[in-house]
Amino acid sequence: MAKQSSRELALERRKALSNSGKKSTTLNGSSPNRIRTASDARLTRTDQSFVKAGKESVQLTAPKREQLDTSFVASRESSGASRRQVKTIRNSSRELVLARRDELSRRGQPAAKSKDRTRAEVEKISSKVSQQDAAKKQVNDLASDQKGVDESSSKSLKSLDTVSRLSSRNSTSRPSAKRRSIQNPSRALVLARREAQSKHGKTAANQPTSAASVARQGDPDLSSREISQRVRELRSKSGATGKKRSGACRPCGPNRNGSKQAVAADAHWKVGLSETSTGQVVTGTQANRSSKTTGNEASTCRSITGTQYLGSEVFDTFCQSAPQPGQPLKVAVTNTSHGNRVTGNEVGRSEKVTGDEPGTCKTLTGTEYISANQANQYCGVSQPSPRKVGQSVTEDGRKVSGVMVGRSEKVTGDEAGSNRQLTGDQYLGVDPLPEGRSAEKVGSFNTLRGAGVTGTNVARSEYVTGNEPGSCKRVTGDEYVGPQQYNTFCGGKPNPEAAKVGLSLTNKSQTVSGTLTGRSELVTGDEPGTCKAVTGTPYSGVEQASGWCDTNSVREIQDRTPKLLGTPGAVMTGLQPGVGGVMTGAEKGACEPLTGTPYVGGDQLVQACGSDAPAGSNDHQGSSESSPWTHFSVQSPARAMQLQRDPRSGVTGTSYEQGSQITGPFNMAVDKITGTEQFRFDRKQRHFKSVPVEATPNDVSQTRPESRVTGEGQSAGLNITGDDWDRSERVTGTEGASARRRNPTRPGPMSAMPAADLKRNEEVSQPMSRVTGSSGNTDQGSLITVSGGARG
């Protein structure tokens, strides 16, 4: 029993704390007045002998260990002796905690072997663990210095063996069913729930509340047979009260009251709901003034500071008007420009605060924390800021939120494909595209000569300052500014410069681009050979011949240029693998145009196909004798002699001027008489007229007009009278050669020196530069110029 009261112990403890602090020996050690009795003491691992044995087990010698191996009785005696010797326990929990911390500091987390335990597990383990196992663990840790107690240890060993056998038998045998007294089912259910919560905590509340689960929660060691017995016992007493039903039970008895049955009055709510004067909802126990309660009339209609807990219905019922708030709201509710609600301290502009006027109506980026009501009050219009997270709807009606990647008026380069239907995941909403077109990233305009130019527009603009100088001046070199600049800022566009790269059309209707090598008005010395036909690759266009030559020269140049046509070709002689003959099977594809070397003549193709002949089949048929390719371009001596011999027809004797009119023997007829002329290699077939030639009468009176000139001056058989030199009905005179001799005339003015002939070269002004062939030259600078560019 304790010899000191609790007050004396407290005073002693405080005195020790004031003298030596928390390290006082009176605090760590147990006082003699707090000694446990022998009945309270039991063998634990925090026993002093148990701790000392752990330290002395390291100092065991080899002979002592052999004695422990050969004689197991000595170890049992030590356990019995330790149980007899009851000593004082000095703060065993503190020593256990210190030992555990020491092990954790040395070995770390593996030294922590403690686990979470419940009361059910502790009881289950304590019933199964035998005293024999506890004695074996103590033998391995105790020292061998207790040799004088062999007899007592042997007796204790026998008693321990008997106890262990009994405990092992009891553990192996199945526990018999315990008889329980009849209890109230609801009380048993509550007790089982509390017991389960004490063992398993909050997890026990989530378990089902069936009869079997309740029985298992009360005693987890029950077998399935015992649980079924408990369930049957409960159902035999209470029926199906604990069983869940799918629907409500229908009344089975007669309704005696009928329609006169009164509706049960609703009970008073434990948790009330009211609304403050500022529109906030307050829930909880209602502390409002009530007509059924006396003593709460004071200060009902006064304004108070702090949290408002009275509902607005109190002021409407007992007061004439609502109270005026004396201080700003502690938590304000405002709306952003996009309609989102923001709660907290209101940091906007206020009429009672000065110095916060700058930046009131400016749009800020980032999180919007200023109310839209402020913009309406001080600025007049609320300008919504750009959304950080946009919302849209797809074509199927699904909502899409996030960064909007659609087309915008403030972004360039996203115009391509904006109106196309794409496959895959839809990331654009059904919102209409913005009106108007943004600034073009790649501009398109025309030069002064009409050529198209694409790229970044570097011309003068109304939105850019500093680019006014030189906007209306003419610049040589590559033209990169369109006529829009001259029409907008200069009033008109200048004449285009000489083309650096010209375009021309050859005789074969092919386009040639590059530096033009034809005749030019600005170049002298290139007149010879302008209108001559040149064979080979044409490098001059038809426009050169049309501008400087007559029609005959242009036609000759066009005829001289061969046209490389495919099928059909020119008229061919010899064996032709053509179509339209006696061979069958050649009709397929005969009238289709082919490329390559022509092996079918145009005459044969026209004869076989008719109107289905390809285009250009008659081009070779129109060649005449005057065409350039029908004559030799070089006159050899033999060719010259042949041309002289043909018109003279030096061979006589067989054909005459009118051979068909000659009569005589048959062998002198045409093509029947052989001779030198018919054996010539280059003879030409003569065509004789077989029809008689009609003689034309020479009637002068019908062809010559009637003359009215009479007199002696008549020289042509007519008599001319009068003095008139012109033929008239009333004038007569001389006419003829005599009249011309009598009246000589001059065709024009005569001078001693002949008149100078006007030539074209005198009309052309003298060029400033001695180098010709390019444009943009001056009389200063280098004499060598780059075609199409500035002098350098």
UniProtKB/Swiss-Prot annotation:
What this protein is called in its record is: Carboxysome assembly protein CsoS2
Bias class Polar residues marks the residues at 17-36, 69-82, 161-175, 618-636, 651-662, 764-785
Mark out the compositionally biased spans (Basic and acidic residues): 1-15, 97-106, 113-126, 218-236
Give the main localization category.
Answer: other
Q: Where in the cell is it found?
A: Carboxysome
Q: Which family does it belong to?
A: Belongs to the CsoS2 family.
Segment Middle region: which positions?
A: 240-615
Keywords from the UniProt entry: Bacterial microcompartment, Carbon dioxide fixation, Carboxysome, Repeat
